[in-house]
């Protein structure tokens, strides 16, 4: 409680810029403040001090509701387990709810719902189905379509793969990256999954105890592996393997590599140089 002995500052001295059109990952240990930070992006939480700026719009402690409504249209927030937010009788009604609440006509909202269902990888035959008759993964895609129906400029993903098996995680993240590219969205991924951050992000923000511990592109951040480990974070599996290979074979000046394909290419070239003969990928 503010002003009491039990007051706890969740975020302090946090300052950074997310470029328009970028894919930014916010990573941090449990309790680092990353999810609290994400909820400030669309005014779900307001700062007790300071300002959150979205283009020409601002969120402050005393921000008036009309501006917040516009901000919440521009910034779509996908929570953990977004399927828990489904409530309508049909998939179509659920996707249409947000746009119609903002004044979009029913006909236009229905057209948008059909297009978005395809975009998230579901057939339009699901439009009249109850969302509660679908599988967990399908329900999550419907919930995501509902967020996209607001046509946000910024998409904030708070641990969007929580509760999914590895294959489901891969499919959902590939879908988000495709949407990021096709819709030219500014995408913010809040995650503890270092492999997803390394694979998709242009920029990475590392949170620790409510502060920004480091920022930079993925090459810069993951080159500081020892510091990440000290913050209670892992490095991506590919980089872990790369560190083992460097130690085993005495390699130097190895750039950060973020996929098995990049690692295979690099090792093939290294072996070719060492042996002086062509070498196929391994």
From Swiss-Prot:
It is found in: Cell membrane. ATP binds at residues 28-35. It holds the Pfam family ABC_tran. Its main location: membrane. Keywords: ATP-binding, Cell membrane, Membrane, Nucleotide-binding, Translocase, Transport. CDD domains: ABC_cobalt_CbiO_domain1. It is a peripheral membrane protein. Forms a stable energy-coupling factor (ECF) transporter complex composed of 2 membrane-embedded substrate-binding proteins (S component), 2 ATP-binding proteins (A component) and 2 transmembrane proteins (T component). This is Energy-coupling factor transporter ATP-binding protein EcfA2. It comes from Halalkalibacterium halodurans (strain ATCC BAA-125 / DSM 18197 / FERM 7344 / JCM 9153 / C-125). InterPro entries: AAA+_ATPase (IPR003593), ABC_transporter-like_ATP-bd (IPR003439), ABC_transporter-like_CS (IPR017871), ABC_transpr_CbiO/EcfA_su (IPR015856), ECF_ABC_transporter_ATP-bd (IPR050095), EcfA2 (IPR030946), P-loop_NTPase (IPR027417).
């Amino acid at each position: 409680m503010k002003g009491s002995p039990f007051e706890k500052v969740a975020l302090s001295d946090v300052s950074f810029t997310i470029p328009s059109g970028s894919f930014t990952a916010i990573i941090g240990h449990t309790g680092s403040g990353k999810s609290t930070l994400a909820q400030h992006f669309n005014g779900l939480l307001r700062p007790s001090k300071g300002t959150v700026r979205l283009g020409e719009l601002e969120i402050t402690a005393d921000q008036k509701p009309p501006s917040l409504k516009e901000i919440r249209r521009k910034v779509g927030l996908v929570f953990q387990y977004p399927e828990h937010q489904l409530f309508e009788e049909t998939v179509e009604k659920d996707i249409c709810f947000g746009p119609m609440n903002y004044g979009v006509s029913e006909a236009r909202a229905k057209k948008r719902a059909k297009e978005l269902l395809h975009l998230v990888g579901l057939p339009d035959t699901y439009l009249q189905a109850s969302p509660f008759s679908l599988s967990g993964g399908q329900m999550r895609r419907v919930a995501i379509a509902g967020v996209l129906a607001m046509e946000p400029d910024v998409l904030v993903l708070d641990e969007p793969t929580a509760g999914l098996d590895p294959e489901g995680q891969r499919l959902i993240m590939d879908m988000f990256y495709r949407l990021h590219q096709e819709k030219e969205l500014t995408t913010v991924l809040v995650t503890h999954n270092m492999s997803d951050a390394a694979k998709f992000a242009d920029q990475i923000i590392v949170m620790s105890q409510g502060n920004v511990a480091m920022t930079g592109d993925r090459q810069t951040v993951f080159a500081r592996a020892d510091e990440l480990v000290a913050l209670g974070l892992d490095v991506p599996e590919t980089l872990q393997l790369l560190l083992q290979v460097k130690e085993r074979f005495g390699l130097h000046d190895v750039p950060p590599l973020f996929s098995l394909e990049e690692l295979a290419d690099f090792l093939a070239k290294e072996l070719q140089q060492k042996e002086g003969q062509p070498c196929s990928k391994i």
